[in-house]
Curated annotation (Swiss-Prot):
Protein's gene: trpS
Motif 'HIGH' region mapped to chain: 11-19
E.C. numbers: 6.1.1.2
Native species: Listeria monocytogenes serotype 4b (strain F2365)
Subunit structure: Homodimer.
Record's keyword annotation contains Protein biosynthesis: yes
One biological process term in Gene Ontology: tryptophanyl-tRNA aminoacylation
NCBIfam families per the UniProt record, alphabetical: trpS (TIGR00233)
Protein name: Tryptophan--tRNA ligase
Domain of life assignment: Bacteria
Residues binding L-tryptophan, per UniProt: 133
Length: 331
């Protein structure tokens, strides 16, 4: 029996080359080896103000992009969080089993609420909803970044508490660190991670950037004055970042790439890298726009929501029985 992976992503901001290299590029491998549930977590998105039309547009866009990068709906389940009611229902049950002090200690809540007036209660209760997302599918593995590891720890605490107090229902999820965890950094500040929410658009290559924009961004990427193409994260973070991108896209080792560019300058290297990135992303963009215009996208999302609901509702019924909600029925 395959282990279960659950992965959720908010439909806010455009996905970057960093998202692709760090996670999306591995979809093909994951869906062959695991039972995968990929959820577009639009309910999480509304913990902060959203434009309703833009949110719906970004939700559909993200689904199309997931399919374009290689998610196979015959092998993995792709769905929208708000279209499976069990998520909100399970979140309420878990919310009644978590303590306010635990929620207030979450680093992400502190960061997002610090110095802000009118912070929504949803931002505070974000972790129980995330826990519901994960636990409903009897998830074994959760691929997350460093910023979410604390939430997974709380999810495990909630699962253990619920299992002991009510019924032994939940699988204990583990943080999943993919084998190939290439970390792509900002083009203008290679000491920080490339981010889809970065205000400076020059810092990131977005998956839907046109070729001319990609070439311009890579050409202007920060390097150094030595002109020598070699990997040294401490002394040459900019060049090292570009070498990482080159290596992941081509499959060549860093040392092979370094040898290839001995005696050549940054100009040649950046030009070649830009063409590699363009060639990698062009077919993804073609598939993306085809899905976006097609009714097939909605058919896939409908089927995904139905499958997800069947799995989630089984766990939800056990949760409701465990705490005594509703009438006890034989069926």
């Amino acid at each position: 029996m395959k282990k279960v992976i659950f992965s959720g992503i908010q439909p806010s901001g455009q996905l970057t080359l960093g998202n692709y290299i760090g996670a999306l590029k591995q979809f093909g491998q994951f869906q062959d080896e695991y039972e995968c549930f990929y959820c577009i977590v639009d309910e999480h998105a509304i913990t902060v103000p959203q434009d309703r039309l833009k949110l719906r547009e970004q939700t559909r866009s993200l689904a199309a992009l997931y399919l374009a990068v290689g998610l196979d709906p015959e092998k993995a389940t792709l769905f929208i969080q708000s279209e499976v009611a069990a998520h909100a229902q399970a979140a309420w049950i878990l919310q009644c089993n978590v303590y306010i002090g635990e929620l207030e200690r979450m680093t992400q809540f502190k960061d997002k609420s610090d110095g802000k007036a009118g912070v929504s209660a949803g931002l505070l209760t974000y972790p129980p909803l995330m826990a519901a997302d994960i636990l409903l599918y009897q998830t074994d593995l959760v691929p997350v970044g460093e910023d979410q590891k604390q939430h997974i720890e709380l999810t495990r605490d909630l699962a253990e508490r619920f299992n002991k107090k009510h019924a032994d229902i939940f699988t204990m999820p583990e943080v999943f660190i993919p084998k190939q965890g290439a970390r792509v950094m900002s083009l203008q500040d290679p000491t920080k991670k490339m981010s889809k929410s970065d205000a400076n658009l020059k810092n990131a290559i977005f998956l839907l950037d046109p070729p001319a924009t990609i070439r311009k961004k890579i050409k202007s990427a920060v390097t150094d004055s030595s002109g020598i193409i070699e990997y040294n994260k401490e002394e040459k973070p900019g060049v090292s970042n570009l070498l990482t991108i080159y290596s992941v896209i081509t499959g060549e080792t860093i040392s092979t790439i370094e040898e290839k560019y001995v005696g050549k300058g940054y100009g040649d290297f950046k030009t070649d890298l830009a063409e590699l990135v363009v060639a990698e992303l062009e077919p993804i963009q073609e598939r993306y726009y085809a899905y976006l215009k097609s009714e097939e996208l909605d058919t896939i999302l409908d089927a995904g929501a139905e499958k997800a609901a069947r799995v989630a509702n089984k766990t939800l019924k056990k949760m409701e029985n465990g705490v005594g909600l509703g009438r006890k029925r034989r069926r």
